[in-house]
């Protein structure tokens, strides 16, 4: 009996020694973790001034030392129906879900890849062609190199692909036109390289569309199902999904974006273009028309609390609570600066030089990494200060400033709130 009891105790101790329990987020007052509350709360008035000036909404959450110290929403999830200002606009709340745009690249695609790398199911030095049959140089290609492209080249954005081929717009895409997922993969294979791979960095949506297809090839699952069932559900995330309107969410739970579909107030036209105010559907054209709302480069929706958990996973070195997705070595591998450009990791943008000041401000540590999204989203993760910031916004939910001059500049994009670094600096400047 004594031997059995001792053996049981030793076995329990042995198992607990190997069990990993990661920090989970709790709330704390700013003063408890080194902030000057009065300075931090000055942001309140400044952001409200930006809302009064026409910025649609801002949702902000700040993490310090495993604590949420600030979480607040300003403005409106929906204030327009087309060009008409609503008599009773829908206020944003801290539970409002936002179109993450290119932050999808990190919190869907990169998280999936980091998990698969940790599990030994993929190596970043593998050739792309290992996972995508027929991915090779085409006859007549002026620039060769697809045959030798590795996943790491795609992650570093040095693969040679153009930034935005605009597959769903036949007027621009020409022979590469596609408004179906299966056709889009074939068009990606046919997309000519614009520069010799490895010769420069060009941030490209195509790179992450390819990575999404690679994840689906490895897992034999659609990208959304894979991340939602193996990453978000184990973490207890309730509001992080692709195609939210197909998964039980309703428009009032989500921040609206462009006023007239993807027409930029009526100056852009192509077959099947949406013209209604976008509300609960991904704004990105390639993600919506060419990929059915689920793509490696865009399509994910979330709220600030769920995003905080995902950022805490990175600060924790790969896990949260009793859930382990990957390890600290994987985090280091993916956030290490590219030797060619210090502002790129493996997908992650890194605070490598002054060019990242508009994103990360001037006070974040050089080791800070994160990403931005075209709809008005920022994630900033600072392992030195053990701090993270998420800003979610719906910047395109305002008129286009001058559609004929530049259809991609919205009135709200001309306001200071559109520059994330300023907000980030006010937060860091509030540290004692």
Swiss-Prot record:
<keyword id="KW-0121">Carboxypeptidase</keyword>
<dbReference type="InterPro" id="IPR022849">
    <property type="entry name" value="Pept_S12_YfeW/YbbE-like"/>
</dbReference>
<dbReference type="GO" id="GO:0006508">
    <property type="term" value="P:proteolysis"/>
</dbReference>
<dbReference type="GO" id="GO:0005886">
    <property type="term" value="C:plasma membrane"/>
</dbReference>
<feature type="transmembrane region" description="Helical; Signal-anchor">
    <location>
        <begin position="7"/>
        <end position="25"/>
    </location>
</feature>
<dbReference type="InterPro" id="IPR012338">
    <property type="entry name" value="Beta-lactam/transpept-like"/>
</dbReference>
<dbReference type="Pfam" id="PF00144">
    <property type="entry name" value="Beta-lactamase"/>
</dbReference>
<dbReference type="InterPro" id="IPR050789">
    <property type="entry name" value="Diverse_Enzym_Activities"/>
</dbReference>
<dbReference type="GO" id="GO:0009002">
    <property type="term" value="F:serine-type D-Ala-D-Ala carboxypeptidase activity"/>
</dbReference>
<comment type="similarity">
    <text>Belongs to the peptidase S12 family. YfeW subfamily.</text>
</comment>
<keyword id="KW-1003">Cell membrane</keyword>
<keyword id="KW-1133">Transmembrane helix</keyword>
<protein>
    <recommendedName>
        <fullName>Putative D-alanyl-D-alanine carboxypeptidase</fullName>
        <ecNumber>3.4.16.4</ecNumber>
    </recommendedName>
</protein>
<keyword id="KW-0645">Protease</keyword>
<keyword id="KW-0997">Cell inner membrane</keyword>
<keyword id="KW-0812">Transmembrane</keyword>
<keyword id="KW-0378">Hydrolase</keyword>
<dbReference type="InterPro" id="IPR001466">
    <property type="entry name" value="Beta-lactam-related"/>
</dbReference>
<keyword id="KW-0472">Membrane</keyword>
